[in-house]
Amino acid sequence: MSEKFEVTNLNMKSGMSLKIKGKIHNDVNSFTINLGQGKETLNLHFNPRFNESTIVCNTLDGSSWGQEQRENHSCFSPGSEVKLTLTFQDKDFKVTLPDGHSLTFPNRLGHNHLRYLSMDGLQISSFKLE
């Protein structure tokens, strides 16, 4: 069973990157990385889904999800080691995947300071904010 990793006092500002290393749990069909203001305000919900070979990104504002952005790209599998870089820019997020592919998702909520990070479905070995 996966455990959730959560940081509630993140100090991520525009121009900064978050580097994550970890191992995807063996018993999951997806994992998530969330960045935002709190559990109910997510500027970026990043959710690779293995059974669909798709990466889903979205925004949560209160109880309202935005329109999903789906990208058909598969470089993740249960039990694999991963390195990801999430770069927070004024107008968007850039996510660099383990295979070098990158995707961009708009900063729909417009915040310039992120306070919240959660990850689920991963065993984190390191994360670095720079």
From Swiss-Prot:
UniProt binding sites for a beta-D-galactoside: 65-71
Domain of life: Eukaryota
RNA-binding in keyword set: no
One example of a Gene Ontology biological process annotation: positive regulation of apoptotic process
Recorded GO MF terms: carbohydrate binding; galactoside binding
GO CC list: galectin complex
InterPro entries in alphabetical order: ConA-like_dom_sf (IPR013320), Galectin-like (IPR044156), Galectin_CRD (IPR001079)
Keyword tRNA-binding: no
SUPFAM superfamilies cross-referenced by the UniProt entry: Concanavalin A-like lectins/glucanases
Keywords, in A-Z order: Lectin
Domain Galectin as annotated: residue spans: 4-130
Subunit relationships: Homodimer.
Purpose of the protein: This protein binds beta-galactoside. Its physiological function is not yet known.
Record PANTHER family: GALECTIN, GALECTIN-2
Protein name: Galectin-2
Gene designation per UniProt: Lgals2
